[in-house]
Amino acid sequence: MSPSDVPINWKRNLTVTWLGCFLTGAAFSLVMPFLPLYVEQLGVTGHSALNMWSGLVFSITFLFSAIASPFWGGLADRKGRKIMLLRSALGMAIVMLLMGMAQNIWQFLILRALLGLLGGFIPNANALIATQVPRHKSGWALGTLSTGGVSGALLGPLAGGLLADHYGLRPVFFITASVLFICFLLTFFFIRENFLPVSKKEMLHVREVVASLKNPRLVLSLFVTTLIIQVATGSIAPILTLYVRELAGNVSNIAFISGMIASVPGVAALLSAPRLGKLGDKIGPEKILIVALIISVLLLIPMSFVQTPWQLALLRFLLGAADGALLPAVQTLLVYNSTNQIAGRIFSYNQSFRDIGNVTGPLMGAAISASYGFRAVFCVTAGVVLFNAIYSWNSLRRRRLAIE
């Protein structure tokens, strides 16, 4: 029996990719707490200049990731997903190492852009698992996998802050590079994939990819849903600490309270994603998606009327529980409506929409709060999510009518 005939242990692959997503999520968020401080250390002075450069180095990674994702997705469909995981982990490790050696802000900005170009571990992990797991377990598997990145993103800022306090800013980049190299080694030694490379001539072109989809309009609506999920999440990020300060008044531990309120949605998503993914396998991911979107609207509106930080924390915890179902439901529906032959590109297109949402969300939140105040951000975000719920419901209804 040749190696390619040996059955894939998808459960082991799920465990290893979960660890990889955890390490990648932690690595990305390790440097986030002190990013403005590092920008300042590289010679940027003045309040407005510091704000501008901090925003640039943050957003340029997502911008270049959105541009590069379709290319890497196409290459994954040609060469396999494992090799893309290896490329991403090793590439990001090298870039993080170089970031710790940056001597000026322009070098750092270019390296942040390069990080976006070479990224893509998590969407390729999703594509790998989506093509290996039995279809009736897709929701549970992708929901479980999503908790890896969420867990890493939750622990990363805490670990990054502690490491920066003890060892300084530059060593954290070297530690982050080591974490990503461990991710590379785990992928190299423990993930298995039976993949027959496809020649460039045999690759489906974009039109053929669209034609091969079971429901192209529904897939587009799922991409838009991914974008709006990230816009809704990102729109609140720039104003959260200031809003908490407005609610809390003059307290000494505002940083702790803000950090706790920022992290509770992630904790809730961590708890809810596998369970709601499993429920989606039973009743259908489309029902989970629509209900979670409606619940999100109903939770966002009262956030604009809260009077204490703890009321906001409770609502954000419940919002996180609902949000934990959204991306896994979208990904499961993408699996149902595409073939393994194009999975890499479909998940990479979805990642591009996610990255665009990561860039536009904070810009939208900052613009609305500057013109209308903090509370207006929650109302506008609720309106955007409500539009998406109606749009998604209409797309899913058309699909159901077409089937009937």
From Swiss-Prot:
Q: What is this protein called?
A: Multidrug resistance protein MdtG
Source species of the chain: Salmonella schwarzengrund (strain CVM19633)
Where can this protein be found? Cell inner membrane
- InterPro entries from the UniProt entry: MFS, MFS_dom, MFS_MdtG_subfamily, MFS_sugar_transport-like, MFS_trans_sf, Mutidrug-R_MdtG, Tet-R_TetA/multi-R_MdtG-like
Q: Identify the keywords attached in UniProt to this record, alphabetized.
A: Cell inner membrane, Cell membrane, Membrane, Transmembrane, Transmembrane helix, Transport
Q: How is it placed in the membrane, per its record? A: Multi-pass membrane protein
Question: From which domain of life does this come?
Answer: Bacteria
Transmembrane spans:
19-39, 56-76, 90-110, 113-133, 144-164, 171-191, 222-242, 254-274, 288-308, 317-337, 376-396
Q: Name one Pfam family in it.
A: Sugar_tr
